[in-house]
UniProtKB/Swiss-Prot annotation:
Residue ranges, annotated region (Disordered): 86-117
Location(s) in or outside the cell: Cell membrane
Annotated family: Belongs to the TrbI/VirB10 family.
Stated name of the protein: Type IV secretion system protein PtlG homolog
Transmembrane segments: 38-56
Domain of life where this protein originates: Bacteria
GO cellular component: plasma membrane
Keywords associated with the record: Cell membrane, Membrane, Transmembrane, Transmembrane helix
Biased composition (Pro residues): 92-117
Signal peptide bounds: none
Pfam family, one: TrbI
Topology versus the membrane: Single-pass membrane protein
Amino acid sequence: MLNRPSSPDGGEAHAWPPDPEIPVFANAEHAHRRPLRWMFALVAVALSCLLATGIWRSRAAPPHAATQTVAPAGQALPPGRIFTVHPREPEPAPLPDMPAAPDPILPQPRPAPPVPPPPIRAPYDYDEPAPRRDSAALKSGPAMMVATAARLGQTERAGMADDGVSADAATLIGRNVSRATRSGDRDYRLLPGTFIDCILQTRIVTNVPGLTTCIVSRDVYSASGKRVLVPRGTTVVGEYRADLAQGSQRIYVAWSRLFMPSGLTIELASPAVDGTGAAGLPGVVDDKFAQRFGGALLLSVLGDATSYMLARATDARHGVNVNLTAAGTMNSLAASALNNTINIPPTLYKNHGDQIGILVARPLDFSILRGTNE
């Protein structure tokens, strides 16, 4: 290869005319370099194939097998890092699903025993003779009503006990349950709630208890409306009490018996009512205000007057003690008088000739009139 002439400063001469006698070997140099390039390219392709083959084998190898590089015969590999691949731990087997707990088996309730049919009992017989009542029971009208209700309640509870109902249940149920009964021959009966018009024959003054009478002013017919059972002119006898409470405006009267013009009598035991059916008889009430408070007021006024007079009559030194003593004495007398008169009961006056009423409280049986012309 020929060297080009250089310039005096050491560089390559810019003007170098080629010598036609000297051959140019530039193309020959390029021709020698081409085989080297192909050789390097083949070596690179071979290395790439080897590298790709090694990577594919390493990935294709099982995960639990450790990779080990074996040197070819007669050659020793340079020392390098050795990686130990531990085998993968097997995943735990899933636990089997526990079966759901079965529903508890409850015992079946036993069927209730059949209830025996209630025994056939005779209905309440109103034909039985009425019990005798003393005068003390007639003095208390509310007590008479309570006794009648208690008797009927005992009858109902006894019937329920016969039907197999407990005593406590019969007591509670008996208040709301009634049994149907037959009233017998309605031509000779007066049912509860019948109104009897009556004219008072005696004056009533409630300072003391006493008797009173009235005369039936209108015929009273039977429950069927066919027969007159209580004719007008029948005398009715009753009793009233004297314990009129403060603020009361009515007196309670209990009528005990009927006396008919034919001579027939029957126990009535029914309360007196006014013309509208309200219980009790109204009248003129004297509340005894003067008797209850007059004495106390008089003593109080006298005490004040005495204190005033003594205050003016005595001197300043001894008047205080005298005034206090007199005032205390009069106040004690007024309090004592008030305690004795404050509980005086009022008095009710009911004049004779007033129109009143009687409300029948129990069934009345007039079967004794059957077969007669009355």
